[in-house]
């Protein structure tokens, strides 16, 4: 027994039944295994942690070394082994959480120390102000800078404009002096009180939170600060942060002009960066900066950056036409290693975007530190956390692809849309001739392969015939529409604004023989859209998906041409409860193969809230106080409306790209201009419909709508039925004979109305109609006519559709329809008639399903 126990492992039996393997049993309680036996069992455990009874018996036969152990004992060994593995994982998880909590506790203690210093400074300034107020004579005679009442604010806003002698790239000592000054100023912002930071609402620390986010208050330019924990080593974090185009979506390019090593092991880089313009109404920005990377004595890594200007000294950077030079004030990243692995990151972004150079209505985009925080500071932290999460292996692969592939797709969609909005000449874009009065800008690119890139497969259209890319874009202001709500509606209700013919043209551009010009195929209609999710970010603020548009047609030719179409779509900023710099919906047609190197031609929408600047000086706050006293609709003050998260104004940017053949360029341009104008009108109509002021607390309840539009529609339905059939609708209840809407609502037969569009969507239903569709008035607009009809119903409608349009009505045979929940319902007969408005113009199509019942 002693020989069997040497180097072995003891396993407690689940029962005390006697066993024949006496050498492995210790007092009937433990079974001891030799190292060779444990090694054999571990090999099997690696292959199959939970073997079946047959597998365990086979194991005993295959391994003679296990022949003296009963199958029941081996079963107990595997049970205990699984328990040990589970305990090991749980212990590891708890250790990780404990390390995070310890690091977060250290972070909070440092934040507390910094806030205490800030409070002490404010108390001192407050006491000084009181002294000045009680001694006005001293305030008038003392002309020193400390006598200014707003000394604290003055101190914050004043940038020391110390003129240094001109220092160029040939003088490393001069650049090192600038770098050391930048490092000191950055550290005073990251861990000191050089900037008065105000924590953003909703950003609370915790082991799984993104970190502590704060924005500047009363300082020159706009600034944002973040500190958080990530499970990556400092060198990896630094590598990610330096690759700015991978996480900063507004970054067009970063060119490192010159690299100078320093004596302390660091590096100085001279960098030229270009950023995209957020809308078509503003010019893009560029930056000429010095970036300094160095290590600190405590093992931390610092990457700091600032613009090289006349006041700082240093060489002059490149000047690019059509760009406005903006300034980076001392900013950067402080990366500290954590005990047990991981890093603690401090991020400071401080810029002056020259807000006075843009139209006044757009200045909030350049004056809001919250927008800067969302676009840069939080984006950097989220990207690092996303990569750390992917590196842990906890994210399952979707569609057979690694997460990095989906990140690349998202970056390509976003970058392609930004390229379309900005239309840089060095990418091949040029303006098409216009009379100057157009609200829609048309640009063409005759070098599409340069724009698409050499890393993707060439488009067959560009390789077979001469052609290019045409972009139609526009921007407009919206009132009282939350960007998240609008973009979510555009995503979920594509049929409300999209033209199936244009979608078909875009999809055909992926094939060698595209349609000539869309606009002629209007009799067919597009079926429902199916959303196939692909990937999403860690906090679900952005997601990638494939949209399948099911194609159908009425005529024989359209059936041959129609086919399912696919869009790769990127959606972000649609959570109304989260703070976001913008809401965006970008999509590009793809084919069924969905190759990694497929060319993408993105189009889409971007909605940016125009929030008023909340961090201005005291004079601005006085104006804000006055405006807060203004009472808006419903008796609510404007301040209370803004505090509730409602966006009063936003700017919408639309850009649609189309490929074209050279001889059809003018035709495609006319189509694109007309289409974008129609989309803008649809979006404006949707914005009015979904504005919060129009959404009451009763929305979604099944009750007859009492709006004037509903009353008018009810009278049109009854009058049109009488005009076409020569008889009135047989009302099941005459109690409300004076109210056509009430009669229509209470009718026992299902009465449904759908739009006269290529893709008919339901616009109205009575109570019975909502019952048969198993939906509500709000969700009714999600349902298309195509979705509820079976094959026989579609054939009957297609054959009778010309009769409806000519004679005004028709009777359809009984059949079966499908509810939104997938349940089938039968009806004895259906009546379809054309609803005419007061001027006898076709308004919609009405259906009455007689004597319906669920099957």
Swiss-Prot record:
CDD domains: bZIP, homeodomain, START_ArGLABRA2_like
Domain START: 168-390
UniProt keyword Manganese present: no
InterPro entries the record matches: HD (IPR001356), HD-Zip_III (IPR044830), Homeodomain-like_sf (IPR009057), MEKHLA (IPR013978), START-like_dom_sf (IPR023393), START_lipid-bd_dom (IPR002913)
Residue ranges, annotated region (Disordered): 1-21
Gene Ontology CC annotation, any one: nucleus
Name of a matching Pfam family: MEKHLA
Domain of life: Eukaryota
A molecular function (GO) term: lipid binding
DNA-binding residues (ranges): 26-89
Tissue-specificity statement: Expressed in seedlings, roots, stems, leaf sheaths and blades and panicles.
Similarity field: Belongs to the HD-ZIP homeobox family. Class III subfamily.
Function: Probable transcription factor.
Name of the protein in question: Homeobox-leucine zipper protein HOX33
Organism: Oryza sativa subsp. indica (Rice)
Gene: HOX33
């Amino acid at each position: 027994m002693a020989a069997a126990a040497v180097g072995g492992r003891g396993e407690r039996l689940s029962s005390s039944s006697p066993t024949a393997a006496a050498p492995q049993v210790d007092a009937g309680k433990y079974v001891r295994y030799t190292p060779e036996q444990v090694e054999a069992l571990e090999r099997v455990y690696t292959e199959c942690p939970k073997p079946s009874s047959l597998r365990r018996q086979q194991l005993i036969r295959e391994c003679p070394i296990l022949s003296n152990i009963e199958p029941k004992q081996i079963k107990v060994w595997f049970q205990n082994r699984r328990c040990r593995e589970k305990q090991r994982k749980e212990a590891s998880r708890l250790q990780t959480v404990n390390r995070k909590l310890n690091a977060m506790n250290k972070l909070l203690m440092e934040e507390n120390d910094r806030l205490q210093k800030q409070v002490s400074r404010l108390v001192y300034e407050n006491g000084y102000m009181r002294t000045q107020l009680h001694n006005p004579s001293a305030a008038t005679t003392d002309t020193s800078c400390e006598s200014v009442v707003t000394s604290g604010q003055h101190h914050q806003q004043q940038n020391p404009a110390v003129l240094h002698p001109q220092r160029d790239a040939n003088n490393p000592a001069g650049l090192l002096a600038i770098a050391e000054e930048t490092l000191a100023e950055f550290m005073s912002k990251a861990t000191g009180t050089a900037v008065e930071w105000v924590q953003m609402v909703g950003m609370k620390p915790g082991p799984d939170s993104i970190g502590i986010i704060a924005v500047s208050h009363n300082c020159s330019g706009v600034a944002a600060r973040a500190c958080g924990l990530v499970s990556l080593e400092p060198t990896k974090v630094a590598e990610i942060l330096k690759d700015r185009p991978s996480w900063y979506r507004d970054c067009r390019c970063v060119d490192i002009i010159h690299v100078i090593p320093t004596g302390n092991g660091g590096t100085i880089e001279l960098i030229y960066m270009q950023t995209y313009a957020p809308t078509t109404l503003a010019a893009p920005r560029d930056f000429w900066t010095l970036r300094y990377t160095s290590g600190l004595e405590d093992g931390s890594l610092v990457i700091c950056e600032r613009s090289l200007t006349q006041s700082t000294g240093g060489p002059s950077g490149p000047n690019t036409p059509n760009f406005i030079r903006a300034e980076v004030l001392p900013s950067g990243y402080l990366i500290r290693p954590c005990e047990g692995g991981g890093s603690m990151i401090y991020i400071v972004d401080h810029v002056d975007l020259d807000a006075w150079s843009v139209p006044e209505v757009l200045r909030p985009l350049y004056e809001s530190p919250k927008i800067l925080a969302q676009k840069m500071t939080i984006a950097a932290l989220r990207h690092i956390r996303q990569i750390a999460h992917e590196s842990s292996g906890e994210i399952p692969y979707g569609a057979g692809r690694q997460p990095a592939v989906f990140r690349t797709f998202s970056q390509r969609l976003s970058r392609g849309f930004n390229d379309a909005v900005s239309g840089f000449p060095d990418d091949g874009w040029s303006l098409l001739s216009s009379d100057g009065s157009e609200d829609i800008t048309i640009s063409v690119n005759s070098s599409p392969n340069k724009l698409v890139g050499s890393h993707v497969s060439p488009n067959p259209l560009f390789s077979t015939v001469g052609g290019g890319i045409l972009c139609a874009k526009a921007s407009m202001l919206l009132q009282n529409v939350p960007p998240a709500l609008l973009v979510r509606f555009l995503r979920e209700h594509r049929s409300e604004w999209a033209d199936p013919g244009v979608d078909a043209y875009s999809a055909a551009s992926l094939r060698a023989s595209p349609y000539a010009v869309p606009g002629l195929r209007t009799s067919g209609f597009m079926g429902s859209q199916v959303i196939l999710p692909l990937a999403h970010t860690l906090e679900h603020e952005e997601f990638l998906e494939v949209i399948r548009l099911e194609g159908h047609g009425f005529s024989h030719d359209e059936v041959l041409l129609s086919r399912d179409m696919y869009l790769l779509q990127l959606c972000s900023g649609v959570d109304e409860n989260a703070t976001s710099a913008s809401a965006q919906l970008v999509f590009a047609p793809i084919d069924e193969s969905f190759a990694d190197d497929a060319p993408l031609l993105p189009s889409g929408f971007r909605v940016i809230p125009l929030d008023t600047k909340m961090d201005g000086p005291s004079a601005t706050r006085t104006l804000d106080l006055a405006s807060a006293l203004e009472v808006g609709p419903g008796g609510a003050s404007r301040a209370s409306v803004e505090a509730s998260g409602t966006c009063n104004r936003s700017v919408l940017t639309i850009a649609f790209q189309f490929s074209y053949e050279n001889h059809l360029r003018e035709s495609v341009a006319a189509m694109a201009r007309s289409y974008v104008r129609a989309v803008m009108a649809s979006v404006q109509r949707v914005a009015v419909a979904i504005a919060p002021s129009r959404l009451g607390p009763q929305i979604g309840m099944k009750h007859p709508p009492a709006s004037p539009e509903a009353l008018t529609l009810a009278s049109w339905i009854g009058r049109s039925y009488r005009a076409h059939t020569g008889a009135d609708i047989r009302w099941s209840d005459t109690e409300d004979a004076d109210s056509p809407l009430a009669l229509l609502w209470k009718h026992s037969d299902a009465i449904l109305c759908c739009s006269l569009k290529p893709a008919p969507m339901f616009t109205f239903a009575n109570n019975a109609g909502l019952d048969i569709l198993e939906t509500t008035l709000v969700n009714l607009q999600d349902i298309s006519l195509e979705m509820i009809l079976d094959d026989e119903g579609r054939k009957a409608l297609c054959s009778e559709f010309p009769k409806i349009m000519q004679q005004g009505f028709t009777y359809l045979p009984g059949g079966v329809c499908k509810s939104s929940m997938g349940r089938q319902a039968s009806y004895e007969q259906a009546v379809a008639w054309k609803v005419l408005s007061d001027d006898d113009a076709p308004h919609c199509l009405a259906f009455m399903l007689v004597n319906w019942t669920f099957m």
